[in-house]
Amino acid sequence: MKKLMAANWKMYKTAGEARTTAASLAALTADTLPDDREVVIFPQFTALSPVADALRHATGYSVGGQDVYPAAEGAYTGEISPGMLMDCGCAWVLTGHSERRHVIGESDELVGAKTAFSINAGLKVVLCIGETIEEREAGRLGEVLERQLETGLAGVKGDAVPAAIAVAYEPVWAIGTGKVAGPPEIVEAHALVRQLLVARFGEGGVAVRILYGGSVKPENAREIIALDNVDGVLVGGASLQADSFSRIILA
């Protein structure tokens, strides 16, 4: 199973800046990318085509959208469809990121609709789940992960697993705060996610990649990736510079 190393560039970088960073990243790892690594870059929408173009000859790299709407087309101002993402060179899309849930107010049901529609349209999905500090302190970790995972995958058929889906566990309290869940917390959460995936998909759930996404940096990436049931990382701030993210990819 290849480790999935994903970069979420959020609302940063112009199209030109994103293209330059992607090209630099590919150059830094051109001769050193291990066979057990797969890299996905999630730039903002206007940078999708430039980044895809910069990576078109980069082995092991692909591009994804940060969001999607569950419709092929229509009167949905400001939205983007799976087909439009693929037209820009995307193979992946993020659904359920904590900033979409907590800043934009997306419901579990909308996340599930986006996930299923995207997979049916031909995209692969990184479904993000995770708890707030209030939920963790209230002892609701298992409840929250089960709800988000069950609703997020409600429309996903078993034959789509594991190739078309990955799950990113992102403790909300550790995103952009500089706080990092310790190894025991990461292992606990990822074990719960694995149990839920196996309960939902049987043997297929064993092979679904589970990523960790909470303030991953070059300094802690190797330790995190070595933990049980950690099959990659979803990186925010530390992925914005090619040198930093290349060190994480090669950790």
Swiss-Prot record:
Its EC number is 5.3.1.1. Keywords: Cytoplasm, Gluconeogenesis, Glycolysis, Isomerase. It is found in: Cytoplasm. One of its GO terms (biological process) is glycerol catabolic process. One of its GO terms (molecular function) is triose-phosphate isomerase activity. One of its GO terms (cellular component) is cytosol. Pfam families: TIM. It catalyses: D-glyceraldehyde 3-phosphate = dihydroxyacetone phosphate. The active site is at H97, E170. Substrate binds at N8, W9, K10, G176, S215, G236, G237. Pathway: Carbohydrate biosynthesis; gluconeogenesis; Carbohydrate degradation; glycolysis; D-glyceraldehyde 3-phosphate from glycerone phosphate: step 1/1. It comes from the Bacteria. InterPro entries: Aldolase_TIM, TIM_sf, TrioseP_Isoase_bac/euk, Triosephosphate_isomerase, Triosephosphate_isomerase_AS. SUPFAM superfamilies: Triosephosphate isomerase (TIM). The keyword Isomerase applies. Involved in the gluconeogenesis. Catalyzes stereospecifically the conversion of dihydroxyacetone phosphate (DHAP) to D-glyceraldehyde-3-phosphate (G3P). Belongs to the triosephosphate isomerase family. Homodimer. HAMAP family: TIM_B. This is Triosephosphate isomerase. The gene is tpiA.
